[in-house]
């Protein structure tokens, strides 16, 4: 009898209710089983989830459900990264309070995530804008302040004069504010900083312990930390060229071996010498102001056009008093890095070469590539940056660059310049302290108080939390906290006099730098419960986009170490395993030059070609490239629409099945339809065979077709488990397709009443295995299938969500036959399939029976047959 079609809408709502009523996924910290903590990067509540969220959280859910089935006590929580500028922008544009906007979005997105059937412990949910959360963050801030890990200092920042706020380097686009479009200014502001540089060496060394992280991410962090070993060299200014009070410039270089290729010295626009020279020099002042219009990051400097201003000053070469180098103020040197001054060697640094060509400076190669002739070697448009031997470098000629480095360092360390060594070896880091001050309302208030008499002091712990006031106005740019009539006025905790609150709020990256620790005991009054934190941390598997490779992941690594110093955790690293998934991408479509949504078009096959037209008008639509889903290009697929049309399981299955998880997955309607057909096929096969299998005890077959069924199922259990352990979800999905194909004929026999007792036992076991293996990917379908089979696994009533992972029999997984390549005179001619335990004589006899061997021997006998056990056979004719 044909089964009714599977109805995902009904089944998914039912099983989600069952899981919730049974509190199936709530985690007990006191559970004695081995722990496993799986976490996906928590979302910003922008309004609705997108398909990227579906893929990210589906992957995490597969891991959580699998590990739960393997007997682990799994922590799989969810929360909201809820502070940030978009809420304030919405407040200004839509006249809605950031708090209201944020919590409305959280409610919508929580409903959407619940509709996915994720095995989340919602009892631990929090939003970073919850007072209860940022209260503990303020406690942490004060703890770190008292440990000397928080400081306040002036710093160059990107200032948006329209929005009246500091912008992160990433928010400066072509010199303009990403939202206002205003030309960004560099300003010196007093800011709060976390002293991440105290941990530079630790953060770098710790990368070597993270063997379950992608090498690409570790390399990105290694480069961002940017440890370099170099030489700090004092260069004397040529007499008569420098202003009074200046006699030298100190440069930092990682390539002192190339000093004989030097063509210029470049100093920062903020170097004391540049500032002095700009007094009364309108042209230089104008150039310095232009330098201040670009971003403050190294990345911004590296991408900007290289410009310089010749100061007329000269410095003496450290090895030749008669050799003078011009000094430029340059827009690619930052005062905060090194000494704010560098020497340029155009032949062996691309930036220096571009600069030298622009200003017609001499280019002298001093490193000769292997195989080149020193007399004829020259530099064209590309600098030579690899190894070689030194040339044009006097006493360094013939040395390797490494040897030349040490020779230069040794000589200059021994050379006296005005009573001090002319050079010292120095280790530098690119990493800079983390400025966390933001001139924004919707963030965690910094718990500090400013008093003219007593200075700056922390808010007393008894007065925490410092709550954001609700009665603020968003009628103009800037920080509403600065304008609040009462909130910023407070009494000094030391003298009792009038004082003011800190009105800057914390960078939202602070909120996400410790949330994984809060999930371990979110009900505690202290930021963490040390016992719970030490039990659960580090996170065993963290999943999120590679766009967070540096900032979020590096800040989290710092914060874990800082919290350890403050006594809140006992680990150094927050995330043991890291997986960075690919994006969900989609075709783009245009009609009349405008982007159009996939929901508004029809695509048909006409004469073998895909043709798109508008649904409403029939107008032709241009099918464009496949790109990341974005609202601007309207190639977004709404998960709500997919779940309403196909069900959550199909959305999950598709994003897991179509591509390796680290690569992008292309969303297609055809792919979703294919997943839908597969779901219906599984349901039909199980539901139609269920009456014959419901009361049968599972038992592996021992012979014939029943043995084949059991072998296929047991092999799949081993393989799918291995695939999930490796996060190779697409391979696991492919194996389940194969297993369904293998079982389909036998299941149909059972449905038709044609299966014998042994086959029924084998099918009952194999079908249970199929259901349990499908469960991490398609949990609702799995529950519905098991219910159809009587709700039992191995004879015991259970939910699939609480059932153990099936156990394979090693004897059924081992192949009894092997395929051996057969060579004739060293060239492969075919294969031999034979019993794995066949002896050498049996193999030799079987080889002689092969048609292609008989043909090659032409009635004769071989000189010999060489058998390499389990590997290969070679017939010498």
Curated annotation (Swiss-Prot):
GO terms for molecular function: aminoacyl-tRNA deacylase activity; ATP binding; leucine-tRNA ligase activity. GO terms for biological process: leucyl-tRNA aminoacylation. It catalyses: tRNA(Leu) + L-leucine + ATP = L-leucyl-tRNA(Leu) + AMP + diphosphate. InterPro entries: aa-tRNA-synth_I_CS (IPR001412), aa-tRNA-synth_Ia (IPR002300), Leu-tRNA-ligase (IPR002302), Leu_tRNA-synth_edit (IPR025709), M/V/L/I-tRNA-synth_anticd-bd (IPR013155), Methionyl/Leucyl_tRNA_Synth (IPR015413), Rossmann-like_a/b/a_fold (IPR014729), tRNAsynth_Ia_anticodon-bd (IPR009080). Its EC number is 6.1.1.4. Keywords: Aminoacyl-tRNA synthetase, ATP-binding, Cytoplasm, Ligase, Nucleotide-binding, Protein biosynthesis. PROSITE patterns: AA_TRNA_LIGASE_I. It holds the Pfam family tRNA-synt_1g. It comes from the Bacteria. A motif ('HIGH' region) lies at residues 43-53. A motif ('KMSKS' region) lies at residues 628-632. ATP binds at residue 631. The keyword Isomerase does not apply. GO terms for cellular component: cytosol. It is found in: Cytoplasm. Belongs to the class-I aminoacyl-tRNA synthetase family. HAMAP family: Leu_tRNA_synth_B. This is Leucine--tRNA ligase. It comes from Brucella canis (strain ATCC 23365 / NCTC 10854 / RM-666). The gene is leuS.
């Amino acid at each position: 009898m044909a089964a009714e079609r599977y109805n995902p809408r009904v089944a998914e709502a039912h099983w989600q209710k069952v899981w919730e009523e049974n509190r199936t996924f709530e985690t007990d910290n006191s559970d004695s089983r081995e722990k496993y903590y799986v976490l996906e990067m928590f979302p910003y509540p922008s309004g609705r989830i997108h398909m990227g969220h579906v893929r990210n959280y589906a992957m995490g859910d597969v891991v959580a459900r699998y590990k739960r089935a393997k007997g682990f006590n799994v922590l799989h929580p969810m929360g909201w990264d809820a502070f940030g500028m978009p809420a304030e922008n919405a407040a200004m544009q839509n006249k809605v309070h950031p708090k209201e906007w944020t919590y409305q979005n959280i409610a919508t997105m929580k409903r959407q995530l619940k509709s996915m059937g994720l095995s989340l412990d919602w009892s631990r949910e929090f939003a970073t804008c919850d007072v209860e959360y940022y209260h503990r963050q303020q406690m942490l801030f004060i703890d770190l302040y008292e440990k000397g890990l928080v400081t306040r200092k002036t710093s160059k920042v990107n200032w948006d004069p329209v929005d009246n706020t500091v912008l992160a380097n990433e928010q400066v686009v072509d010199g303009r504010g990403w939202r206002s479009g205003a030309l960004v200014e560099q300003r010196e502001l007093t800011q709060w900083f976390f002293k991440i540089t105290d941990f530079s060496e630790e953060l770098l060394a710790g990368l070597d312990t993270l063997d379950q992280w992608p090498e690409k991410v570790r390399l990105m962090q290694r480069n961002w930390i940017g440890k370099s070993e170099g030489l700090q060299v004092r260069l004397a200014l040529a007499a008569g060229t420098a202003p009074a009070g200046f006699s030298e410039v100190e440069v930092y270089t990682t390539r002192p071996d190339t000093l004989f290729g030097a063509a210029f010295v470049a100093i920062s626009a903020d170097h004391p010498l540049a500032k002095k020279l700009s007094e009364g020099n309108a042209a230089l002042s104008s150039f310095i102001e232009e330098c201040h219009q670009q971003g403050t990051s190294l990345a911004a400097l590296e991408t900007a056009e290289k410009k310089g201003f010749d100061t007329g000053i000269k410095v003496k070469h450290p090895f030749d008093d008669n050799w003078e180098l011009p000094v430029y103020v340059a827009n690619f040197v930052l005062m905060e890095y090194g000494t704010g001054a560098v020497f340029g060697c155009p032949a062996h640094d691309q930036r220096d070469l571009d600069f030298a060509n622009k200003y017609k400076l001499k280019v002298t190669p001093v490193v000769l590539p292997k195989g080149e002739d020193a007399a004829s070697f020259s530099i064209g448009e590309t600098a030579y940056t690899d190894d070689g031997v030194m040339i044009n470098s006097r006493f360094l000629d013939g040395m390797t660059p490494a040897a030349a480095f040490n020779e230069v360092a040794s000589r200059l360390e021994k050379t006296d310049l005005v009573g001090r060594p002319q050079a010292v070896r120095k280790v530098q880091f690119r990493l800079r302290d983390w400025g966390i001050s933001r001139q924004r309302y919707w963030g965690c208030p910094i718990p500090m108080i400013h008093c003219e008499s007593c200075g700056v002091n922390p808010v007393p712990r008894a007065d925490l939390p410092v709550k954001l006031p609700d009665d603020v106005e968003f009628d103009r740019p800037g920080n509403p906290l600065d304008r609040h009539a009462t909130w910023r006025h407070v009494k000094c905790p030391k003298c009792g006099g009038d004082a003011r609150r800190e009105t800057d709020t914390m960078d939202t990256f602070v909120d996400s730098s410790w949330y994984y620790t809060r999930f371990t005991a979110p009900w505690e009054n202290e930021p963490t419960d040390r016992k719970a934190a030490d039990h659960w941390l580090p996170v065993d598997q963290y999943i999120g986009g590679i766009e967070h490779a540096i900032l979020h992941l590096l800040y989290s690594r710092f914060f874990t170490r800082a919290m350890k110093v403050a006594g809140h955790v006992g680990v150094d690293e927050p995330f043991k395993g890291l997986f960075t998934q690919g994006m969900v991408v989609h075709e783009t479509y245009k009609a009349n030059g405008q982007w159009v949504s996939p929901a508004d078009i029809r695509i048909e096959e006409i004469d073998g070609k895909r043709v798109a037209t508008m649904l409403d008008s029939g107008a032709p639509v241009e099918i464009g490239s496949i790109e990341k889903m974005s609202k601007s290009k309207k190639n977004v697929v709404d998960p709500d629409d997919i779940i309403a049309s196909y069900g959550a399981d199909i959305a999950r299955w598709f994003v897991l099945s179509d591509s390796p998880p680290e690569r992008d997955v292309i969303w297609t309607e055809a792919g979703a339809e294919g997943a839908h057909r597969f779901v219906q096929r599984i349901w039909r096969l199980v539901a139609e065979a269920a009456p014959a299998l419901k009361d049968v005890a599972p038992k592996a077959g021992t012979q014939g077709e029943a043995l084949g069924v059991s072998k296929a199922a047991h092999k799949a259990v081993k393989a799918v488990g291995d695939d999930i352990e490796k996060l190779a979800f697409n391979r696991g999905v492919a194996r389940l397709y194969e297993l369904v194909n293998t079982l389909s004929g036998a299941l149909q026999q059972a449905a038709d009443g044609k299966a014998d007792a042994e086959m029924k036992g084998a099918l009952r076991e194999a079908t249970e295995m199929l259901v349990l293996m499908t469960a991490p990917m398609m949990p609702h379908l799995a529950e519905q299938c098991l219910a159809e089979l009587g709700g039992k696994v191995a004879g015991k009533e259970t939910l699939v969500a609480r059932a153990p992972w099936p156990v394979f029999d090693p004897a059924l997984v081992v192949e009894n036959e092997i395929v051996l390549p057969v060579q004739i005179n060293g060239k492969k001619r075919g294969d031999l399939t034979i019993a794995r335990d066949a002896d050498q004589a049996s193999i030799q006899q079987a080889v002689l029976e092969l048609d292609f061997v008989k043909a090659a021997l032409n009635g004769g006998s071989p000189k010999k047959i060489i058998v390499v056990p389990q590997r290969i056979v070679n017939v010498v004719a």
